[in-house]
Amino acid sequence: MGKIIGIDLGTTNSCVAIMDGTQARVLENAEGDRTTPSIIAYTQDGETLVGQPAKRQAVTNPQNTLFAIKRLIGRRFQDEEVQRDVSIMPYKIISADNGDAWLDVKGQKMAPPQISAEVLKKMKKTAEDYLGEPVTEAVITVPAYFNDAQRQATKDAGRIAGLEVKRIINEPTAAALAYGLDKETGNRTIAVYDLGGGTFDISIIEIDEVDGEKTFEVLATNGDTHLGGEDFDSRLINYLVEEFKKDQGIDLRNDPLAMQRLKEAAEKAKIELSSAQQTDVNLPYITADATGPKHMNIKVTRAKLESLVEDLVNRSIEPLKVALQDAGLSVSDINDVILVGGQTRMPMVQKKVAEFFGKEPRKDVNPDEAVAIGAAVQGGVLTGDVKDVLLLDVTPLSLGIETMGGVMTPLITKNTTIPTKHSQVFSTAEDNQSAVTIHVLQGERKRAADNKSLGQFNLDGINPAPRGMPQIEVTFDIDADGILHVSAKDKNSGKEQKITIKASSGLNEEEIQKMVREAEANAEADRKFEELVQTRNQADHLVHSTRKQVEEAGDKLPADDKTAIESALSALEASLKGEDKADIEAKMQALAQVSQKLMEIAQQQHAQQQAGSADASANNAKDDDVVDAEFEEVKDKK
């Protein structure tokens, strides 16, 4: 069995880790970094860039540089959170035919899982380069508060990237695994506060140790899947835009290039203010008007940033109270607080969390790497490399069906340990009803319409009977990934209908297969592109070395040969401007054939040089015998 890699597919950054013996190891990508920006760019010449290369060109290509895609994955276009992003993102968010939030990239419609798959492919390649073997299996993490559609979409992204997703696990749970595996023995209750680039989670986790086996049991989880560092950046960007408008009378929101530069500067300023009390946002030539170029130079203090984002930090406190209440615990029951996600480096966040729990968060957990490490540990558990670890996660939201009067009737309540299975018997609402519609919902509201619709299906062939007589057994079965399977059975006729919830939206099997094929085709195209680049480099080297040899040969090279070589060189240089690898190779071969006389001259010159240097060495040796210099040491006067 090959390695199961652990991937933290983050909103802002992603990270990949593997089990190396009994220790998890975070892997460096091709750029030498342990985390990779979750940024994907589609360039004008058709190239797809991922990570740092994509980030570097964002200023000049804002419409086709995609970031924070995790905020759209598994979401409907009409969702309130998506509509908020539509107005502020430089790229174009559109509604797919099924109502999902998709993206328009250079006129092509693309699904968020398809785009996230590019990041996963880079993580896969990073692991393959390190291991020296193909990687086909992964554990991928998601925010604990992700709903069924978002989890399913994440699995789809894995498939498109060529990975079999062996398990989806919650990010705070993964962080707890990373923390708890090598920590002190005994029973502990920990709170994992996870504020990342786009999502927020809180999980209360109990770590029990019995006879050397550690059980990680999630007692409760809560959160907000649309709260994170991107929102903090937006507040600072808006402030800078308004300040510039007051000063210069120009609204930068109408200038995509300026906004992209401003986004980078705001992110940098936010990070600097975690360690400094003040920073300058200095952007020369940010824009121009009839009077000439305009420059931005605005001082931002830590206090100013904190005043801009205080309500965002406070938004994360309410879920902490709910999670503790759901776990049946008080603040004093928590032994350790762990911070995960880059945004937790902000001193204000650390202070608020410390105030709430009455204790300082631990500083020995890397907020950027803990989640990927935990995913790798779970991969090790699945392969049997990691023993004596049992992970008991929960479903974050209640699951149920719509019943008479538009009511949501839960079958599985939130914070139930998974995997789990629950059945309940329902009946018909009308006399002689021959079919029922099972409408599956996820959420905590009483009214069905206020919850997230996960999908619906019909159970037909119910025998005619007075209302309330037929017995229809509905079974909900949640697997270890937190994905729901629903069945409905008429106990009288034995008729049964089953579905795996794919949401009323989501990608269908045909779409996923098409994207898998496209990804494979792209991989082939990437391989051909690499080969073309290598051939071009060889040809460039050949052109350079041949010209140098022609120059060195001088009059020794016959005029006919020189003309033939110049002609072959021109043909090769013209070929280099094209994309045809075979043509470049043919022109290289042609140049080699007409350069045979030149090669002979070059070899003769090389041999003469060697002989000359040998003679010089011999003369020097003789001189060594004859000359015996006398010298005396002159000491410097101190």
From Swiss-Prot:
Gene3D superfamilies: 1.20.1270.10, 3.30.420.40, Actin, Chain A, domain 4, Substrate Binding Domain Of DNAk, Chain A, domain 1. This is Chaperone protein DnaK. Signal peptide: none annotated. The keyword Nucleotide-binding applies. Belongs to the heat shock protein 70 family. Keywords: ATP-binding, Chaperone, Nucleotide-binding, Phosphoprotein, Stress response. It comes from Cronobacter sakazakii (strain ATCC BAA-894) (Enterobacter sakazakii). The modification Phosphothreonine is found at T199. Induction: By stress conditions e.g. heat shock. It holds the Pfam family HSP70. Residues 603-620 have a biased composition (Low complexity). CDD domains: ASKHA_NBD_HSP70_DnaK-like.
